[in-house]
Curated annotation (Swiss-Prot):
Keywords: Heme, Iron, Metal-binding, Oxygen transport, Transport. This is Hemoglobin subunit gamma. InterPro entries: Globin (IPR000971), Globin-like_sf (IPR009050), Globin/Proto (IPR012292), Hemoglobin_b (IPR002337), Hemoglobin_oxygen_transport (IPR050056). PROSITE patterns: GLOBIN. It comes from Cheirogaleus medius (Fat-tailed dwarf lemur). The gene is HBG. Residues 3-147 form the Globin domain. Heterotetramer of two alpha chains and two gamma chains in fetal hemoglobin (Hb F). Gamma chains make up the fetal hemoglobin F, in combination with alpha chains. Red blood cells. One of its GO terms (molecular function) is organic acid binding.
């Protein structure tokens, strides 16, 4: 279980309140599919993923990215119970979708990059550290059913 300090929780929730879930979610998932093309195999029903521009403009990528970040928003509300928050999604991704749990870490890292890009100077080293901890905690929670 990941333990967040009061300061880390404040930093995470403060920035989260400014995040455009649709935009950041689509961009983070799109970046994952471009930078790590083997992850595309989990999204064969998304249509054209033949190039970076096709991926970044794909409405299904954007919609799923929004869905992913909406789930992250629930986790931010429940930072003290990430495992419980993601129990169902962990089971789904493990048992039905057979997603390599390493991909959760990769997507988390892409999200941190997107947040840094969007928030610039506001994304200080302290903010980055808190968010890295958050996405790592989420990756652990999502991988829980794999163990």
């Amino acid at each position: 279980m990941v333990h967040f300090t009061v300061e880390e929780k404040a930093v995470i929730t403060s920035l989260w309140g400014k995040v455009n879930v649709e935009e950041a979610g689509g961009e983070a998932l799109g970046r994952l599919l471009v930078v790590y093309p083997w992850t595309q195999r989990f999204f064969d029903n998304f249509g054209n993923l033949s190039s970076a521009s096709a991926i970044m403009g794909n409405p299904k990528v954007k919609a799923h990215g929004k869905k992913v970040l909406t789930s992250l928003g629930e986790a931010i509300k429940n930072m003290d119970d990430l495992k419980g928050t993601f129990a169902h999604l962990s089971e789904l991704h493990c048992d039905r979708l057979h997603v390599d749990p390493e991909n959760f870490k990769l997507l988390g890292n892409e999200l941190v990059i997107v947040l840094a890009k969007h928030f610039g100077k506001e994304f200080t080293p302290q903010v980055q550290a808190a968010w890295q901890k958050m996405v790592a905690g989420v990756a652990i929670a999502l991988a829980h059913k794999y163990h």
